[in-house]
Structures are given as C-alpha cells and as structure tokens.
Amino acid sequence: MFLKSLHLRHFRNYSEQSVTFAAPKTILVGDNAQGKSNLLEAVEWLATLQSHRTHRDRDLIQQGHESAQIEATLERQGVPLDLAVSLRPSSGRVLRVNGCTVKRTADFLGQLNAVEFSCLDLELVRGTPAIRRNWLDRILLQLEPLYSQLLQTYQKALRQRNALLKQAGSQGWDEALWQAWNQQLVINGTRIIRRRQRLIERLAPLAQDWHRVLSGDRETLTLSYESHVPLGDGTSEAIVAAFSEALATRRAIEFLQKTSLVGPHRDDVGFCLNAQSARQFASQGQQRTLVLALKLAELALVESVVGDTPLLLLDDVLAELDLQRQGILLEVMGDRYQTLMTTTHLAPFAAPWRQQAQILKVTAGTIASVSDTAAQTSD
C-alpha cells in the first residue's frame, strides 16, 4: 500500500494544500502548531473515520468555514484507488471511493490502513478506560469494517436506554420498551465484547514478543480484557446470560443513577508488567516501552490480517524514546512500511537516513518540499 497524494481543503489549519509523496519515508519538519499533526490526522481519518484527538467533525473544519474535504490517491497491490471525504456538520459526511458515493461507512473503511503512534498514546497506559476502548475500536474498524455498524447499533440502544432511565419513576413507564432496548443492548454488546476479547488474544503474544526485545527480556507483559460482564467460557451464550443477569442485578442502582452501568461502554484493558498493574506502578520509561510494544504489535497484526503493509504515522514520537528504542523503531520501519513522521528538528535522523527520505517543511498550514541541506539549515 502506498499513499501517492493527499489534498486538504479547509481541514484544520489547511486552507488548500496538495502533497505528493515521493519516497517510502516522509519527514514533516517544522515548529509546533504549524500543522504537522493535522496532516497525519487527515490520513488517520481516512483509515478509521475517526480521530484520536477529537470526537467532533466540527473540530476538523477550518475556522470560518462550513465544510472540509480530504482527498487521497493511493496504490494498493498495484491497483490505483481514489478516496474522498466531505465533512459538513449540517448535513453529515459524504464518502467516495473512486468517484462513487458510498452510503455505508463499512464500504469505505478498510480501503486505506494505517497505524498511528503519537506522544498522546502514552495515555493508553495512564489514561481513562475510554482511551483504551477507543484504541481497540479503531483497530477493529480497520480489520472488520462491519464493526462500525455494530458500534452504531449498540450506541443507539445505549442512548435509548439511558433516555428511558431518565424517565424512571415518572408516569407512563413502558416496561415492554425497556425490555426491548435491554435485549438490543445485550445482543450487540455481546458481539462487541467477543470481538474486543479476540483482538486482545491476537495482540497479546505479538506485544509480549516485542516487549521482551525492548526491555531486554527483563519484564513480562500481560494484556487482559476487563469486562463488567463475566465472560465465562467466552461463548456468546455464556456472555448473553451473564449480561442479562448483570442488568437485572444492577437495575435498582441504574434507576437511581439514571445511567447504564453494565456493558462494553464501561469495559477496560489491563496491562501488567511482572504481574503488577502498569497503570499504577510503571515508570514513565516503562510506559513508553509498553506503548511502543503495543504499536509494533498493532502494526504486525493489521498487516497480517489485511494482507498488505499499512501506513505508519509517527507524530513526534522519536522525541519520546531513548536512543535504543529509537533505533529499534527505525530498524522496524526500514523500507517495508511507508512512513509519515513529524518532528521539530532533524537531529534524531542520521544523514544517510535523511538522504533517503522526502523532507517537507510545514509552516502555518503550508507545505513545501526542501532538500536535506536546506532542512538542516532551517533546523
């Protein structure tokens, strides 16, 4: 898979910008807040129809404008592919593949695959459960595009159920409607739980292997999916039964708090180093190592499932890693993955490495191609 060009219109701080990618490695260099991360975010959005930085399309649109466009040309296993997205909060998204509008997000997802790694990913260890759930969901959206419909169906059931909970105690309570939404929550929630659990089972050995390399085999990493619903033997039948029982048990407290307390929207992912919680006990260096292992595992898994090399998006990551881990990451990248990376300076990159890369200077939403010598002068 190779991203050949990208065109942004009124996306974040880009008024109108086209970029042609001419090498397997592209370095976006520039001061902070110039738009380097925004370009990577646009590529990530094409891969997942989500951003790890915001949940609102409105935030992606340049101030003073009503819509934004992202267009990309790529080559996948020798076949050219054109992708286009229009974002307009007033009327929704318009998705196009090879010039044809697609109605279902599942028909757009999976056309471009990318793994994003930024300094914000340290929150995977120390942040809230929602960050870890969203990480799993973004991976699943690429591996199984129909997962997007499953998430939407579950979220609709959750919204409707919460709306009913806010009416609890008032006249006109509809028990039949309540049970109907409970059933939808259980059926679709079970499917989400099983897919997330399977994803963890596939990621775990890959992450463990990478973590052994990165830590010098001094620590053992374990991953676990921590569900509010007892998983039992992991079958759909067992989870449905446990989910239904949990809803019945928590009914009184849910009526009191007027929100849904059971389901995959409350679940978490556990990371342990030598059987101790990484969130509670890992040092900052250990957290960086853990996250790098997770991202390398994600990269390997996406490649193995989709049968093609995903794009690698590195947002100011090298500054967060020591020299040993920088070296491992750069070695893994090699020429195998098309890589877009951002940096404020070129010092971490050896001269031969820079000579093989396309170097782009980003200044206030404008991108210019520069030679290695010019880039060093501006550094």
Curated annotation (Swiss-Prot):
Highest taxon in the source lineage: Bacteria
Gene Ontology annotations for the cellular component aspect, listed alphabetically: cytoplasm
List of residues binding ATP: G30, D31, N32, A33, Q34, G35, K36, S37
Signal peptide positions (record): none
Keyword Cytoplasm: yes
UniProt-listed SUPFAM superfamilies: P-loop containing nucleoside triphosphate hydrolases
One family name in Pfam for this protein: SMC_N
Molecular function GO terms recorded: ATP binding; single-stranded DNA binding
Location(s) in or outside the cell: Cytoplasm
Cited Gene3D superfamilies: P-loop containing nucleotide triphosphate hydrolases, RecF/RecN/SMC, N-terminal domain
GO annotation, biological process: DNA replication; DNA synthesis involved in DNA repair; double-strand break repair; SOS response
Keywords, sorted A to Z: ATP-binding, Cytoplasm, DNA damage, DNA repair, DNA replication, DNA-binding, Nucleotide-binding, SOS response
InterPro entries: DNA-binding_RecF, DNA-binding_RecF_CS, P-loop_NTPase, RecF/RecN/SMC_N, RecF_2
Family: Belongs to the RecF family.
Annotated function: The RecF protein is involved in DNA metabolism; it is required for DNA replication and normal SOS inducibility. RecF binds preferentially to single-stranded, linear DNA. It also seems to bind ATP.
Official protein name in the record: DNA replication and repair protein RecF
Source species of the chain: Thermosynechococcus vestitus (strain NIES-2133 / IAM M-273 / BP-1)
Gene: recF
